């Protein structure tokens, strides 16, 4: 094991190199990071495991990185020991905000490209972000050990993109470790050292934070100027709070306590604060004894793209859901939430997410880490609605949609960049046209791959657009998108009525052309999920007061003639009339309870394949209650 000589707090800036690894999802960032940890010797061989820096169970199971991880790595080059600050970043489009925060803590970026796949949409997106942050770019082809790798072809693609020679593109294998030592040498040569002022008052940028059940908030910082000591009071310049640090240290690869952190170093600080409002990502940390006067430029707050309601199945868990979201917010700065009430689902929160994967991950973490059983409403985007009387409404939830005549509805748009093999151009064009996309430009990035630019309503992308894109291109296409203003659209609110009563959880804002198909789909789904009652239940879809689709759940019928053996027909008729009158009265007074399982199944965006299983569960639950 290599002994690390550069001690935190006393490391000269000239030997520090802070860099991050950026790439499209599944191009091998975490595997290359594993080899770097192995080569540097900071992780003993017996403790090494795949995806070492992916600490969450979800990350290990799904094979994706969700949280950026910062690690201090020693590396000797030409007899001098250097200190590398490495940040492994996520690759999925939903976690672009994580990547942008990591870039602000670095001077260089390793742009990793899969030698079997070539440049993909998120490769370009991350590259442009790194260029915006003025970082030194080191292009690298990974997975060169695979038989299907085409390093020469893809090296030319990369060279054409960033303006270097194909021979400048490094070739590595995260699996075998080939070329990784050369990559570390290249990082030392190409990435500039930090240029903070070690003698100035301490200034550190908070670029992340996590919640520890025992020690409270763990704040990750990048020191820009000066020095912070473990016995020195610290001051948060943005929120104006002062703390006594319990511990200061670096991550190498586990938390390692140190006496101090100096300019250019990346580390952590624990103040013992348990209140989530006491640590804000993007804030500047300084010494309370010798404070800085000017804070560092922070981050632009992320803007949620998708909204959905989260409701506890057991309403008594509402306070626990609030605490869980507060703690998760520390670890996930892009999550926003406000309390909301639903007639059907009770108390819950309206949550804003960066995309569907982000929404899925938050839901899963709430379930695993905090033991909560939740119902999630269908995802939707925000709309700006102008009513006939001129009143303005910002709608994040279909229940906020104003009644009466609507003058104008404005919906958010995205600029979508799709990279696909040329044989699928027609299929991609059809898909985008079906989703109200407007084509921009199209350019060939190599002889057989095309980058297509579309302007598409965000609402069309947040449901199943990506799945359909993968399906129509046999998995070869990749998608990246970002905000691109707004435009007016012909949208309507579709309400679902059960027994004549609106169920707010099933309401949706859809394009007028798709309103009928949504109404038919939901009424059919609910007909198969809601148990039969003693009276007939109508399920209707409506736009305002106009019914556009209807399904009926037929009544259960008791055989009232079973005890009549022959005899007078008038006796039988009397019993049937009595039953008919009873059912009529029951229909007027009867209240339909929609089971929780039916809500969960109806609000899932998948097909109806599991409806029969859900129905069986509902019946079993009812028998148990009976």
Swiss-Prot record:
InterPro entries: EF-4, EFG_III/V, EFG_V-like, EFTu-like_2, G_TR_CS, LepA_C_sf, LepA_CTD, LepA_IV. GO terms for molecular function: GTP binding; GTPase activity; ribosome binding; translation elongation factor activity. Its EC number is 3.6.5.n1. Keywords: Cell membrane, GTP-binding, Hydrolase, Membrane, Nucleotide-binding, Protein biosynthesis. Residues 14-195 form the tr-type G domain. Pfam families: EFG_C, GTP_EFTU, GTP_EFTU_D2, LepA_C. GO terms for cellular component: plasma membrane. GTP binds at residues 26-31, 142-145. Gene3D superfamilies: 3.30.70.240, Elongation factor 4, C-terminal domain, Elongation Factor G (Translational Gtpase), domain 3, P-loop containing nucleotide triphosphate hydrolases, Translation factors. Residues 609-626 have a biased composition (Basic and acidic residues). The keyword Zinc-finger does not apply. Residues 603-626 are annotated as: Disordered. It is a peripheral membrane protein. It catalyses: GTP + H2O = GDP + phosphate + H(+). NCBIfam families: lepA, small_GTP. Required for accurate and efficient protein synthesis under certain stress conditions. May act as a fidelity factor of the translation reaction, by catalyzing a one-codon backward translocation of tRNAs on improperly translocated ribosomes. Back-translocation proceeds from a post-translocation (POST) complex to a pre-translocation (PRE) complex, thus giving elongation factor G a second chance to translocate the tRNAs correctly. Binds to ribosomes in a GTP-dependent manner. This is Elongation factor 4. It comes from Bifidobacterium longum subsp. infantis (strain ATCC 15697 / DSM 20088 / JCM 1222 / NCTC 11817 / S12).
